[in-house]
UniProtKB/Swiss-Prot annotation:
Name of the protein in its database record: Dihydroxy-acid dehydratase
Chain positions recorded as [2Fe-2S] cluster binding sites: 50, 123, 195
Domain of life assignment: Bacteria
Entries under PROSITE patterns matching the protein: ILVD_EDD_1, ILVD_EDD_2
Cofactor binding comment, as recorded: Binds 1 [2Fe-2S] cluster per subunit. This cluster acts as a Lewis acid cofactor.
Coiled-coil stretches noted in the UniProt entry, renumbered to this chain: none
Length: 557
C-alpha cells in the first residue's frame, strides 16, 4: 500500500495537472508527488503564553517531516486564552473554540486530501479540539503539546496564574495590599507555556500521553526547554512511520485507552474539564462512554500526585519526578491500566513502560508511593439528585469536608455572583448557585475561576459550596460542583432554585439535592418560563442552537 493513498487524489494522473501546478507554487518538485502529504496544524499565537512558542515546534516538526521523506503543509488554527478572557463575556467563546478548532483541522485535512496530520497546541481547548478532529477523520495523526510554563517565584513561593486570581480575593479582604497584589501579577507568569499546575491543559496533555496519541514524557516538558523541540521533531518521525504502517487514531482511541486516560486523570488530580472533553472525544471516535464511567473509575484509582491547584507542585516538578510514565507504571502494576493498548509508535503501553520503576524515587514527594496516596479514591465525583438528574461533576480535593448543607445564594450570571463576593455578601455555610451559564444558556459554559478563586482568597474555600451549570477552570478547587445537567436554560431544576432554599452537596453519597417538597418543586416547574436567548446572531447564537447537554460532552454534531 502506498504512503500517499489519500493525497494521490490530488497528485496523480494527467487530470491533476492543475492541482500539481498549484502544489509546485508552494514548494513541491518533480520528486515530491509520490510522498505522503502531512498537515502541520499550528496553533501559534501571541494571544496567550500557552501558544507563544508553538511556531518553533511547528518548524522543527516541518523539518523532520521533510527529512523523513514526507511533504509538510502547515496551516493555522485559532486559540482563545482562557486566562485572559476569564471573568468576562469573552469567556463564552472558550468552549466554542474547541468546536472551531476541531472543525478547522478537519476542514483543512479533508479538503486537501492529506495523508496525516501533526497537531500542535497549547491552551486548554487546543487539545480536545485537535483530538476531536483526529478521532472524527481517522487519518494517521499525532498530538504535540506546546509545553508547560515554569513556575513564577515571589517571597520564596512558587506562583501560577491561579495565584493571581486568588490574590484578588486576598486584596478585597485586606489580607494583602495593592503593592503585594502588583508583585503577584508581575511574577505569576514568567514566560511561554501553558498554565503550570495540573490545570486543564496539563491534564489533557497528560491524558493524551496515557492514551497513546503523544510521545512518552512529552506532556510534562517545559515549553522553553530544548527537549521540547527534540520531542516535536521525533513526533513528526513517528507520525511518518505510522502513515507507512497505517496506524490510525481509532486503532489507538478505544474504550480501553480512554479508560487508561481517565485513570491517569484521577491519579494526577486532573481538571473537571477532562470529563466534558473525553465525552466529546469518545463521541468523535464512536466509542461508547458515559458520565457514569468516570464515577466507576474514580472508585478504583487513588490520587498519587501532589499537584496544584490544591497541592504543592507544578507540572515541571512532575516531569523531574518521573513524568506520566512513572504514574502509568504504578497503575499498570496494580491492574488499573490496560497494558495491551497500542500507541502511535506501534508499541503497546506495557512495552513502553517495561523499564520504568514500579515505585517512584524516594528523593521526591511529587508522586506518592502506592501505599501512601494523597487520596485513596479519585477526586472527580459524579453527583446526581433532583438538582442534577443527568449528573454533574464535583472536584473534592483541598477541602476539609466533602459535604455541606446550606442556604442557596442564587445568581443568574457570573458577574452578579462576583459582585456579591467582592462586596463580602457571601457567608460561611452558604451554597452559591450560578445559573444560566450552561452550554446553551451562557451560551458557552464559562469557567467560574474568578468567583471560586475570590472565595478562596477571602478564606471561604472550606466553608462555602458553589454549584453551576457552567464549568470550572482546571485551576479551581474547593467544594465546587459544575456541569449541572439539565441546565437552567432548558428548564433544569437549577432554574427553579430560590434564594434561601436548602441545598445539600454530598460528595461521599454522590448527591446534589434541592431540599424542598416534591409538590413545591412541581409547582415551580409549571410556573417556569424559558428565557429569551442572549444572542440571536453570530457564532454564539449558532452554538446555542447546536450544542448538547454537558452530560453528553457539549457536542455539536
Amino acid at each position: 500500500m502506498s504512503d500517499n493513498q489519500r493525497s494521490r487524489a490530488i497528485t496523480q494522473g494527467a487530470e491533476r495537472t492543475p492541482n500539481r501546478a498549484m502544489l509546485r507554487a508552494v514548494g513541491f518538485s518533480d520528486n515530491d508527488f509520490d510522498k505522503p502529504i502531512v498537515g502541520v496544524a499550528n496553533g501559534f499565537s501571541t494571544i496567550t503564553p500557552c501558544n507563544k512558542g508553538l511556531n518553533e515546534l511547528a518548524l522543527a516538526a516541518e523539518q523532520a517531516l521533510k527529512q523523513a521523506a514526507a511533504m509538510p503543509q502547515m496551516f493555522g488554527t485559532i486559540t482563545v486564552s482562557d486566562g485572559i478572557s476569564m471573568g468576562t463575556e469573552g469567556m463564552k467563546y472558550s468552549l466554542v473554540s474547541r468546536e472551531v478548532i476541531a472543525d478547522s483541522i478537519e476542514t483543512a485535512v479533508q479538503a486537501e486530501s492529506m495523508d496525516g496530520v501533526i497537531a500542535i497546541g497549547g491552551c486548554d481547548k487546543n487539545m480536545p479540539g485537535a483530538m476531536i478532529a483526529i478521532a472524527r477523520m481517522n487519518v494517521p495523526a499525532i498530538f504535540v503539546y506546546g509545553g508547560t510554563i515554569k513556575p513564577g517565584h515571589y517571597k520564596g513561593k512558587d506562583l501560577t496564574i491561579v495565584s493571581a486570581f486568588e490574590a484578588v480575593g486576598q486584596y478585597t479582604s485586606h489580607k494583602i495590599d495593592a503593592k503585594e497584589l502588583l508583585e503577584v501579577e508581575r511574577h505569576a507568569c514568567p514566560g511561554a507555556g501553558s498554565c503550570g499546575g495540573m490545570f486543564t491543559a496539563n491534564t489533557m496533555s497528560s491524558a493524551f500521553e496515557a492514551m497513546g496519541m503523544s510521545l512518552p514524557y512529552s506532556s510534562t516538558m517545559a515549553a522553553e526547554d530544548g527537549e521540547k523541540l527534540t520531542s516535536a521533531a521525533r513526533s513528526a518521525e513517528v507520525l511518518v512511520d505510522a502513515i507507512r504502517k497505517q496506524i490510525r487514531p481509532r486503532d489507538i482511541i478505544t474504550r480501553k485507552s480512554i479508560e487508561n486516560a481517565i485513570a491517569v486523570i484521577m491519579a494526577v488530580g486532573g481538571s473537571t474539564n477532562a470529563v466534558l472533553h473525553f465525552l466529546a472525544i469518545a463521541h468523535a471516535a464512536e466509542v461508547t462512554l458515559t458520565i457514569d464511567d468516570f464515577e466507576r473509575m474514580r472508585g478504583k484509582v487513588p490520587v498519587l500526585c501532589d499537584l496544584k491547584p490544591s497541592g504543592r507542585y507544578v507540572a515541571t516538578d512532575l516531569h523531574k519526578a518521573g513524568g506520566i510514565p512513572q504514574v502509568m507504571k504504578m497503575l499498570l502494576d496494580h491492574g488499573l491500566l490496560h497494558g495491551d493498548c497500542i500507541t502511535i509508535s506501534g508499541q503497546t503501553i506495557a512495552e513502553i513502560l517495561k523499564d520504568v520503576p514500579s515505585e517512584p524515587r524516594e528523593d521526591q514527594d511529587v508522586i506518592r508511593q502506592w501505599d501512601n496516596p494523597l487520596y485513596v479514591q479519585g477526586h472527580l465525583a459524579i453527583l446526581k439528585g433532583n438538582l442534577a438528574p443527568e449528573g454533574c461533576v464535583a472536584k473534592i480535593t483541598g477541602v476539609k469536608s466533602p459535604k455541606i448543607t446550606g442556604p442557596a445564594r442564587v445568581f443568574d450570571s457570573e458577574e452578579a455572583c462576583m459582585a456579591a463576593i467582592l462586596a463580602r455578601e457571601i457567608q460561611p455555610g452558604d451554597v452559591v448557585v450560578i445559573r444560566y451559564e450552561g452550554p446553551k444558556g451562557g451560551p458557552g459554559m464559562r469557567e467560574m475561576l474568578s468567583p471560586t478563586s475570590a472565595l478562596i482568597g477571602e478564606g471561604l474555600g472550606d466553608s462555602v459550596g458553589l454549584i453551576t451549570d457552567g464549568r470550572f477552570s482546571g485551576g479551581t478547587y474547593g467544594m465546587v460542583v459544575g456541569h449541572v445537567a439539565p441546565e437552567a436554560f432548558v428548564g433544569g431544576t437549577i432554574a427553579l432554585v430560590r434564594e434561601g432554599d436548602s441545598i445539600t452537596i454530598d460528595a461521599e453519597q454522590r448527591l446534589l439535592q434541592l431540599n424542598i417538597p416534591g409538590d413545591e418543586l412541581a409547582r415551580r416547574r409549571a410556573e417556569w418560563q424559558p428565557p429569551h436567548p442572549r444572542y440571536t446572531r453570530g457564532v454564539l447564537a449558532k452554538y446555542s442552537k447546536l450544542v448538547s447537554s454537558a452530560s453528553r460532552g457539549a457536542i455539536t454534531d
